Amino acid sequence: MLHSRAASFESTRVSVPHRYALSVTTYLDDILVAHRRRAAKDERRRDDLFDAVGNLAPTRAFADALRGESLRVIAEIKRKSPSKGELSIDLDPQVVAQEYASGGASAISVLTDEPHFSGSEEDLQAARDAVDLPILRKDFTVDERDVLDARLMGADAVLLIAAALSDLEIRSFLAVAHEVGLDALVEVHDGGELDRALAAGARVIGVNQRDLRTFEVDTDRCVSLASLIPSEVVAVAESGVRDAKDAERLAAAGYNAVLVGESVVTASKRSSAVSALVGHQVAASREAVR
């Protein structure tokens, strides 16, 4: 039964070990404090959530949608961000999702964090209703109930940020995700986090080129880590992808997909912005490309 493992997750709420904490206070720290406080007050029974998931239709295959010989695009519905402020605060998620799909996106990412990104569950559901593409819930997962909520609101994949989670949490949340049919994009920023994600069993790795402390983007980060990602793992490049040249370089390094937000959501013609990024030949092997 779907909830057969639920009891084993009752004790998995774990504070992030100090060795995994960021060296200075960042926007991520503040967000995580808020999300963990919310999770600590959540009195819903996990068994009830597992039972509710059991009544849902199958998910759309997120990881499979990112595989292929040409570069895939995960286009993001993002109203604002802590680093850039308002991007497209009054967007219609259904319209944006359709624009992304017409441009050739293979999946849609939707921010659901409200306080910091002005996202919502309703944005995700509207996007899902508008297109047939897999939907990634982009939020700060700190409890297994966040994973179950993603499934219940209609997501096909969930984000796990390695910098925000302990090894036990990554493994536990991956197990819950797979139990309920979700794929998980495990986000890393360096080789140490990549090793942790792979050891936990991550099947989809996202390398984020944005520094969580300074917001600066290091466009060499993805290519320098590419050769460390096993060929059977789906590799996604995040942040700093602005044009066809960036996309081509990442495809040449062996990345299966790019996740893009600001550059497409603020474009005057979103479908064209997406189409400029798709279709680049993905290298047969992953290696650092300068």
Predicted regions and their residues:
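N-terminal active-site wall of soluble small-molecule enzyme domains
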Residues: 72, 77, 84-185, 191-196, ...
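An N-cap/entry alpha-helix motif that binds or orients negatively charged groups
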Residues: 23-90
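C-terminal helical cap(s) of enzyme catalytic domains, especially alpha/beta-barrels
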Residues: 224-228, 266-290
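Catalytic cores of alpha/beta
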Residues: 142-153, 191-200, 241-260
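Glycine-rich phosphate-binding active-site loops on the catalytic face of alpha/beta enzymes
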Residues: 149-169, 207-214, 255-273
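Conserved, mostly hydrophobic/aromatic
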Residues: 31, 75, 100, 150, ...
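Catalytic-face loop-and-helix region of soluble metabolic enzyme cores
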Residues: 204-260
